[in-house]
């Protein structure tokens, strides 16, 4: 993703999306596809060759697509050679962020943005911020049930650095510990998702030992027991045994087997954590003037680049912040003019004073 911020507050956003024959030759983007980005009305589509900054309007002719396909040969796809770009202009950063094309779990990512101008006479500072709302509520079992907040932040976002000054062997040992905790959290949520399906069919449970609300309230305790097992070896029979023991009843056993889920529910379960691990992109930001604070991003050749992934706003909001400075040339001109005028006035005043003094 490329974001260009202008001095007047307007901005442009460009994202790169995967293109196939249909998109390239018709210009119609399939928003029903499981992709991070969704293109609504108002976006202009372009295509360009990989490694080339040239842009060409979409749609391209079918003949052009076939020509490119022949050029790349049978062993490669056109999408490996041709990129598709979607571009949109905005009047303000606020409008741009409110219209974010990025989606997490079928919901538009919550993004608040702003551009503040701080006037300093000889220069003006531009402060760009973009804040992503936390997705913690998406997961029924919080990660802090299995890891400390610091551990989770380091594992999913890379900060804070918990290994400063530690030897490599210790680093490896701690990472293994974190991985085990993170895996247990993942499987705890999957188990919760699976078992909460029983609540959706609670009217079909024969002689339930507790009410539906009480069943849901105890699910986190149940999945914590299940999380103590090796996820790769946990079988449905074990899950049934744990639940029967916890509730003192076999009433839920018929709902815990491989055939109980519909195809849609099975696909939803498969995608449940896919959203967390597949939501990933780099955002490059071009600011007016010279960047004086990259805010943790990587600054190179006038561009600040941040990696945006769901892990960074798993626990709390994630903010991007870049500060740039524009020199107000006119301020130097005005200051120089005022200084010259003042100098002339002082000299002229002295000459007038000397003239009248000489006449006395």
Task: Indicate where each model-derived feature is located.
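Extracellular/lumenal and peripheral-membrane lipid-interaction modules
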Residues: 20-22, 273, 350-356
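Start-of-domain marker
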Residues: 1-64
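Functionally constrained cores in energy, signaling, and assembly domains
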Residues: 13, 19, 88, 293, ...
């Amino acid at each position: 993703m490329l974001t260009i911020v202008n001095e007047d507050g307007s901005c442009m956003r460009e994202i790169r999306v995967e293109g196939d024959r249909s998109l390239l030759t018709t210009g119609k983007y399939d928003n029903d596809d499981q992709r991070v980005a969704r293109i609504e009305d108002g976006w202009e589509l372009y295509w360009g060759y990989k490694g080339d900054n040239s842009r060409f309007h979409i749609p391209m002719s079918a003949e052009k697509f076939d020509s490119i396909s022949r050029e790349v040969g049978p062993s490669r796809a056109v999408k490996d050679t041709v990129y598709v770009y979607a571009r949109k202009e905005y009047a303000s950063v606020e409008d741009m962020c409110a219209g974010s094309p990025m989606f997490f779990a079928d919901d538009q990512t919550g993004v608040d943005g702003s551009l503040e101008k701080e006037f300093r006479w000889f220069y003006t500072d531009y402060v760009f911020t973009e804040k992503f709302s936390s997705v913690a509520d998406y997961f029924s079992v919080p990660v802090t049930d299995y890891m400390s907040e610091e551990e989770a932040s380091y594992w999913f976002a890379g900060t804070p650095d918990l290994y400063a000054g530690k030897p490599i062997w210790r680093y490896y040992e701690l990472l293994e510990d974190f991985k085990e905790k993170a895996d247990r959290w993942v499987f705890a949520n999957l188990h919760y998702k699976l078992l909460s399906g029983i609540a959706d069919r609670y009217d079909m449970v024969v002689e339930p030992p507790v009410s539906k609300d009480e069943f849901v309230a105890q699910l986190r305790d149940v999945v914590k027991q299940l999380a103590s097992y090796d996820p790769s070896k946990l079988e449905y029979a074990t899950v049934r045994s744990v639940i029967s023991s916890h509730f003192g009843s076999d009433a839920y056993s018929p709902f815990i087997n491989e055939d109980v889920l519909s195809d849609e529910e099975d696909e939803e379960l498969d995608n449940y954590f896919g959203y967390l691990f597949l939501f990933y992109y780099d955002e490059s930001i071009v600011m007016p003037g010279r960047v004086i604070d990259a805010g943790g991003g990587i600054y190179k050749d006038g561009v600040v680049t941040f990696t945006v992934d769901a892990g960074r706003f798993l626990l709390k909001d994630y903010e991007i912040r870049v500060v740039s400075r524009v020199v107000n040339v006119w301020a130097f001109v005005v200051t120089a003019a005022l200084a010259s005028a003042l100098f002339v006035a002082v000299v002229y005043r002295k000459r007038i004073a000397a003239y009248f003094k000489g006449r006395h």
